[in-house]
Structures are given as structure tokens and as C-alpha cells.
């Protein structure tokens, strides 16, 4: 006569980390659910912080004139226009006239706020979906303004602007703000739960 045994599984203990989404609220998908390896989550967090520097450094340099790409007398706070000069004289390719027509104080503000907003979102790990759209638009415009498809460019298809856009997509889809960031708490806010595009 054979005996059968019944295996019972204990419910996951939220305090032990067995239920990744439990800490952020029931039904909420977190990075632990999407990226299962801890090392991968940490690598994505490093990439996110590196991406933050890509946006925040030019913002600070153009605002203060730190002497790297922007000399002190060309700082925004010194009265210079961070985007106008480039749009009027630095754009290459067939869209040069279009970009020159866009030059003005409004584009200066949009450019600087874009750098600051996307950089802070990446640094804090919140609002990555909005940041990805804004960052992709900003870097897409920069790609068009440099027109790398012209002869003599380093790479006519994928340059640093395209790589940053791809990085933003990866960081957003892997919920990279949850590790070493405020993404998990941000996602649990009632407003963000009602409007997931804010995540």
C-alpha cells in the first residue's frame, strides 16, 4: 500500500523579500518582478545615475559657465543664450534653416528645463516614463541638428544621441528607478497609481 504526501507551501513572507511587489503595495509591479538578478538591477541603477550626469552636467555648465564646454562669460546667468547660438550657427544639414527659425528665449528655457528635468528624474528614479519621452525628444532634435547621415560623420546611424535614447527606453522598461532611487515609493503614490504614465 502506497502512501501519498501532500506538500504545502508557506505563504511568502514580505519581510524576507520573497514577495517583491508587496512592499510597494498589492498589485504593483516593481523592478524585482521585471529584473530578477540583483547584479543586473544594480547595473541598471548605475546606468541610470550615469544618465543623470549626461543631462545634469551640461545644465550646470551652461547655467554657470564652469569653463568646460561653456566659458564663464557665456553662462546663462551671465546673460548668454544657451540654445540660441547653437541653433543659429551650429546646426548642420538641410534642417539648419528650420532650427535657426526656432531660436529664441523660449527655446533656451525649454532646452535648460529639459536638461534639468530629465536629469533630476534619472537621479531620483521617478517619472522615468515622462523623462524618457522628453529626453528622447531632446536628443532626437540634437541628432537631427547634427545631421550625422551626411558624408564624413563618424556613424551615420547610431551616435551618442541614439544611444542615450536607447538607454532611456531600457531604464524605463526595467523600472530602474526602484534600485538606489525613489521609484518604488513614487509608484505607490495614489496619483501615480491612477496615472501610470507618471511612473
Predicted regions span which residues?
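Extended, low-polarity transmembrane helix blocks
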Residues: 1-89, 94-117, 124-199
Amino acid at each position: 500500500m502506497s502512501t501519498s504526501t501532500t506538500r504545502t507551501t508557506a505563504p511568502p513572507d514580505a519581510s524576507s523579500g520573497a514577495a517583491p511587489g508587496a512592499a510597494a503595495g498589492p498589485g504593483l509591479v516593481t523592478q524585482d518582478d521585471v529584473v530578477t538578478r540583483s547584479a543586473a538591477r544594480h547595473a541598471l541603477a548605475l546606468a541610470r545615475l550615469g544618465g543623470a550626469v549626461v543631462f545634469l552636467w551640461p545644465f550646470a555648465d551652461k547655467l554657470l559657465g564652469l569653463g568646460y564646454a561653456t566659458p564663464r562669460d557665456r553662462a546663462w546667468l551671465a546673460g548668454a543664450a544657451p540654445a540660441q547660438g547653437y541653433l543659429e550657427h551650429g546646426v548642420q544639414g538641410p534642417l539648419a534653416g528650420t532650427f535657426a527659425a526656432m531660436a529664441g528665449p523660449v527655446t533656451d528655457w525649454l532646452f535648460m528645463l529639459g536638461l534639468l528635468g530629465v536629469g533630476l528624474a534619472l537621479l531620483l528614479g521617478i517619472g522615468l516614463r515622462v523623462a524618457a519621452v522628453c529626453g528622447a525628444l531632446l536628443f532626437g532634435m540634437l541628432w537631427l541638428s547634427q545631421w550625422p547621415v551626411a558624408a564624413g560623420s563618424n556613424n551615420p546611424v547610431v551616435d551618442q544621441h541614439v544611444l542615450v535614447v536607447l538607454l532611456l527606453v531600457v531604464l524605463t522598461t526595467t523600472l530602474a528607478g526602484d534600485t538606489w532611487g525613489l521609484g518604488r515609493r513614487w509608484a505607490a503614490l495614489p496619483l501615480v497609481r491612477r496615472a501610470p504614465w507618471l511612473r
